[in-house]
């Protein structure tokens, strides 16, 4: 791969990038300057200021004629650069002193170059995933998901993957940096399950996965990377966080804390559970459930994950009742209703932040549960 500095007609802004990519190949510029990837840094890398600047990352393996390039060379292409050769396009800027600003995107390119030899691959495709996640995520060559987050969280994800390595529905970690600066997952092809078409089939897979959870013998409760003192403390924290985003008219806290008190007297199974087990992390292909991604590994009760999954999508909620969940989980009605009340309160908070259009349905379900 080479990284080129492009000016004039090879530049475009981020908003028009997708539209541009859909229409034509990129015409060659009269001003394309080569930069060696390992020499890009904020201290020694700068260009004379022009109106617009773009970094163009090109996979030289896909070019018919690979130009001989060294740092500082100006390159002239006689033909348009094929889109298949474009790995990434990155606008960059100058500060008030006309000094080049090393953007996070450039750092990402350098980071990916560091990873490629560890995977023993030549990178010919590079894509960002930024769909509502707190992690920094890339897709390489359509096969590898590279994730950056806090080392504590990534370590817990790696351990979760190892624990369930024999479960084909749980995404597999294939590489972890020794200090957990990043981990690399296998990519599960498909689409996020925004719409649930086959509820019975999905519930079968939800039950199959939650029934497969293994005992957790560590001292932690709740999130492994940010543990609580107990399972009940974890639930109280989740409820408190949810209460901060719900309006005062949602005067449901007395019922929620009563439900927490009920759970204190119910059987508790301490298992290693997914922790963010919702349809937003379920992948489907050709209508079929094929896998689950993005765990927040948690030491907790499998019932938490089961109900979390059922509440994560309004298509499922419309079919729920306490009796239905008792039948599906085999847990007592007392425990199911208590966990349902707690989880539903937290789900209404998430709904306000991510999909407000469903809130009325969740509120209606709340009153339905309270009336039972």
Put a short name on every predicted segment.
Residues 1-106:
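Conserved, structured core segments of small domains
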Residues 108-118, 133, 143-184, 193-212:
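A conserved alpha-helical element in kinase catalytic cores
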Residues 111, 215-275, 285, 365-370:
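An alpha-helical support segment within catalytic cores of ATP-dependent transferases
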Residues 135-139:
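Conserved ATP phosphate-binding architecture of protein kinases
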Residues 151, 179-198, 236-244, 342-359:
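A glycine-centered beta->alpha junction motif in the catalytic cores
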Residues 272, 284-330:
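Active-site Asp-x-Gly
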Residues 280-282:
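Hydrophobic residue at the +6 position relative to the catalytic HRD Asp in the kinase catalytic loop
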Residues 308-372:
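Helix-rich C-terminal or lid/interface subdomains of diverse kinases
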